[in-house]
């Protein structure tokens, strides 16, 4: 059993998680999940230094890409609100990163009574991006 990974690896003393060397532990990681697409969607943020959940939202009817987008904006807004300037945000969603850079959620999700609340959250996120430096 000596080949089993140690959590955390002995060479990482800045995290409780098994992170590769190139990943900064002083960071938050965001991710979304969706059961079906569209379907029940939720997202969360984890502090890589402590492993603690920073926030969680959902489930709400949506898509995975929307959840990834909202998770990034939620993390950015929370960092701004708390005056956190020394952390990195990690996201594995290229689409969400592009949408954040363009300050617009480019979803094709149909706007219906079931998705209206989500569209209001998206509008709030887009407005936050337009009114804050990212």
Features from the language model and the residues they span:
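RNase H catalytic domain
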Residues: 29, 33-37, 77-134
């Amino acid at each position: 059993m000596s080949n089993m990974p140690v959590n955390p690896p002995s060479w990482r003393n800045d995290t409780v998680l098994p992170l590769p060397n190139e990943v900064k532990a002083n960071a938050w990681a965001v991710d979304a999940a969706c059961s079906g697409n569209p379907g029940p969607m939720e997202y969360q943020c984890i502090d890589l230094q402590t492993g603690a959940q920073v926030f969680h939202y959902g489930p709400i009817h949506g898509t995975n890409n929307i959840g990834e987008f909202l998770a990034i904006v939620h993390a950015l807004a929370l960092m701004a609100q708390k005056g956190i300037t020394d952390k990195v945000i990690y996201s594995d969603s290229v689409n969400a990163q592009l949408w954040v850079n363009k300050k617009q959620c480019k979803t094709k999700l149909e706007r219906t009574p079931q998705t209206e609340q989500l569209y209001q959250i998206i509008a709030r996120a887009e407005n936050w991006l337009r009114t804050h430096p990212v």
